[in-house]
Regions:
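Short, charge-rich amphipathic segments
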Residues: 1, 29-35
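SAM cofactor-binding core of SAM-dependent methyltransferases
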Residues: 1-19
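Redox-cofactor binding/interface segments in oxidoreductases and associated redox assembly factors
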Residues: 15, 32-33, 75
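Class I S-adenosyl-L-methionine
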Residues: 20-28, 38-178
């Protein structure tokens, strides 16, 4: 309702994603989305991650990707996604990466804390950028990779740079602090 009032000339459909016929979604180059975060808590062993009541909405995004095959994806979720579920830490994120790989996407991701950009609260989010391997950007990503890609050429490199703490420990400790 708020979106419609602010953008009255935009065709907006607020249909439950579980009721959408994916074939009827218009062709698009970029799919931007997020999925509910409640099932990614690592504070409780009851959180079910990708198998939870709301966590399963990732699978709707994945189904849309399989049907529409957009060239690019930009997804967002809480940082807890990286360690979910608590009994198999990291499983859910690994599943998401594997799903995208299976659909021939290259993936770059970054955990971004709003406090690092002037906001008065710690609000860490994981952003996932994926592009088809057949795109110019995908080919470049697969060719370059490694530290150079993450620090200089990657999708997030300029706007969200990685701050290397120590040249002795290398980039691994900054990218994979867990």
């Amino acid at each position: 309702e708020c979106y419609s009032k602010n953008f009255p000339d935009i065709n907006f459909d607020n249909t439950d994603i579980n009721k959408v016929d994916y074939e009827k979604i218009p062709k698009h180059t970029l799919l931007v989305g997020g999925f509910p975060c409640q099932d990614y808590s690592v504070a409780t062993s009851q959180a079910k991650g990708l198998q939870g009541k709301k966590g399963v909405l990732w699978w709707n995004i994945y189904d849309i990707v399989k049907v529409k095959k957009p060239k690019y994806l930009l997804l967002e979720n809480v940082d807890r996604l990286l360690n979910s579920p608590s009994k198999q830490r990291g499983r859910d994120f690994a599943v998401i990466l594997a799903c995208l790989r299976d659909e021939n996407y290259s993936v770059e991701w970054r955990m971004i804390n709003a406090a690092d950009y002037g906001f008065p609260q710690k609000r860490r989010r994981v952003f996932i950028f994926a592009c088809k391997n057949t795109t110019k950007f995908g080919k470049k990503m697969n060719k370059e990779q490694g530290e150079s890609w993450i620090l200089k050429s990657g999708f997030f490199a300029k706007d969200f740079p990685v701050k290397i703490k120590s040249f002795d420990t290398g980039i691994q400790n900054d990218l994979f602090p867990f």
